[in-house]
Amino acid sequence: MAGVIAVMAGLSVRTAPTLVIFDFSTGSGTVTIPASPISAVIEVWGGGGGGGFGLEGVGDNGGGGGGAGGYSKTTIASLTGQGGKTILYTAGVGGTGSNTPDPGNTGGTSSVSSGTYTITPMIAFGGGGGTSDANTIQGQGGTASGGSDTNTTGTGGNFLTRAGAAATAGVAGLQGGAGGDGGLPTIGGDRGEPGLPGRVRFVFTI
């Protein structure tokens, strides 16, 4: 079994490393580094912005799509002797879509910071909300900072197609914090869709 030390003929043989994964899309908390850690990869996505309000006869394009949250990634090459120490995290919420001729709400900020283990703070801001179709502005992508590997600004939403921005793909194509679609240009108006929540993912190799 992976991660288990087998004793055969008086010899200790360690099998392939094991992955311990913590994956959060809501709230704040503490992650404890598992025992006998080797290394870690940490990814942070900000929450997606909400879509804008759509109303027929104003711009007839519908509301602007919300922007995607920023993305930050850090690799910790060596965690020897750090088992039991803690790291703090917050996963940002998705922004709500607009139900009035106002922009959708900005997505929440996601972050990783030091607990008893010292780490450079990682911050991924949420994407901006799309505007109503009375304006020609889509939600802007959130920025990111602090990652040792990557800090990527999220893609902006689309005004003409109402589409919310796709999230930045992380390791193995995983995502978080896509923007919400803008509302349809209908009589009486159509509410924008909410952005998807941010995400914080820890993958420890032990």
Question: What are the residue ranges of the model-derived segments?
Answer:
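Glycine-rich strand-loop-strand elements at beta-sheet edges
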Residues: 23-28, 44-114, 130-141, 145-150, ...
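Acidic, glycine-rich loop-and-strand cores that form catalytic or ligand-binding grooves
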Residues: 113-172
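Outer-membrane beta-barrel transmembrane strand signature
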Residues: 172-181
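A residue-level signal for beta-strand positions that form part of recognition/binding surfaces
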Residues: 19-21, 39, 86, 109, ...
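Extracellular/periplasmic catalytic domains that process cell-envelope and extracellular macromolecules
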Residues: 34-36, 81, 116
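Surface-exposed loop/edge segments in extracytoplasmic proteins
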Residues: 18-20, 52-55, 118-122
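Enriched but not universal
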Residues: 1-41, 75-76, 196-206
